[in-house]
């Protein structure tokens, strides 16, 4: 006779992951030698990377992004999604958010020539396909990157506003706002900032709602080219 034995497993009722601490660790450990070209590869190949990881069962995978190597925990593989990730560990989602913040910090402090270099190299596919460009503001543009919602204060609530707008337009299910609604804002728990920062969220939503949203399959480079002939898309 076969005996099947089962034991109760204590549920993880609260997360100890702190995006601010994790981001500081990321900058300290992983940004030496990091270039805008490496970040460009990560974002323009984002869908391909995600698809590749979803097909591999390995828990830890090293990504080689044009020579910059970074190891991530593969939560994209269905069988790995419930695996606990260390607080200082990187996932594809965390890495995306960290790089978005890294770029914003650069944009806010570097020289104008370097800003132009960043804008020429970094393309946000999720923003571009909705007709949103760098001209709409760096905070807005970078807020379209997954993971930016970890830093609602840094990005001035734009990641949340983008999500709310998409839900209002029936372009996204409300359930996808859950992760954003669990985030802190400048140290404030969600239960606090959802009450005290309502005006700020509404202001961010006003900005997002006024953007020139339009679905397009034309690349940013193609739009710039056509604009020279008086064709705006």
UniProtKB/Swiss-Prot annotation:
Keywords, alphabetical: Capsid protein, Eukaryotic host gene expression shutoff by virus, Eukaryotic host translation shutoff by virus, Helical capsid protein, Host gene expression shutoff by virus, Host-virus interaction, Ribonucleoprotein, RNA-binding, Viral nucleoprotein, Virion
Secretion signal, residue range per the UniProt entry: none
InterPro entries for this protein: Bunya_nucleocap, Bunya_nucleocap_C, Bunya_nucleocap_N
Gene Ontology terms describing biological process: symbiont-mediated suppression of host gene expression
Binding of RNA, residues: 14-15, 18, 47, 50, 75, 81, 94, 123, 125, 128, 166, 176, 182-184, 217
Compartment(s) of residence: Virion
Recorded GO CC terms: helical viral capsid; ribonucleoprotein complex; viral nucleocapsid
GO molecular function ontology, one term from the record: RNA binding
Family: Belongs to the orthobunyavirus nucleocapsid protein family.
Subunit (UniProt): Homotetramer. Binds the viral genomic RNA. Interacts with host PABP1.
Its job: Encapsidates the genome protecting it from nucleases. The encapsidated genomic RNA is termed the nucleocapsid (NC) and serves as template for transcription and replication. The NC have a helical organization. Seems to participate in the nuclear relocalization of host PABP1, thereby inhibiting host cellular translation.
Protein name (Swiss-Prot/TrEMBL): Nucleoprotein
Organism of origin: Bunyamwera virus (BUNV)
